[in-house]
A protein has these predicted regions:
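N-terminal acidic leader/helix
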Residues: 1-28
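A generic structural signal for beta-strand entry/edge sites
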Residues: 1-3, 36-40
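Intrinsically disordered, low-complexity N-terminal regions enriched in serine/proline/glycine
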Residues: 7, 37-38, 58
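Helix N-cap motif at beta-to-alpha junctions
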Residues: 9-13, 42-50
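Generic alpha-helical hydrophobic packing signal
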Residues: 19-23, 38-44
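Short amphipathic alpha-helices in soluble, non-transmembrane regions
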Residues: 19-20, 51-60
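RNA-recognition motif
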Residues: 30-36
Length: 60
C-alpha cells in the first residue's frame, strides 16, 4: 500500500485514480478529503511500487 498527500490544485483525485487504475491493472485507489486544499490518496494491490512512485512523483 502507498499513501500520499496531494493538493487539489495539482490534479483532480478522480482523474488520478483513473490514471492509476488504467496503468496498473488490479490496483485499487481511494481518496479522502483532508481539507479544502488537500486530499490523501491510498493505492493497494499495485505490483510495481517503483513505477507507482514515479507516477505519483508528478503530483506530490
Amino acid at each position: 500500500m502507498k499513501t500520499v498527500i496531494i493538493e487539489y490544485a495539482v490534479i483532480d483525485p478522480v482523474t488520478l485514480i483513473n490514471k492509476i487504475e488504467k496503468a496498473f491493472p488490479g490496483a485499487m485507489a481511494i481518496f479522502t478529503d483532508i481539507d479544502e486544499d488537500y486530499f490523501e490518496l491510498s493505492v493497494w494491490c499495485c505490483n510495481d511500487l517503483e513505477m507507482l512512485e514515479d507516477v505519483l512523483a508528478e503530483y506530490v
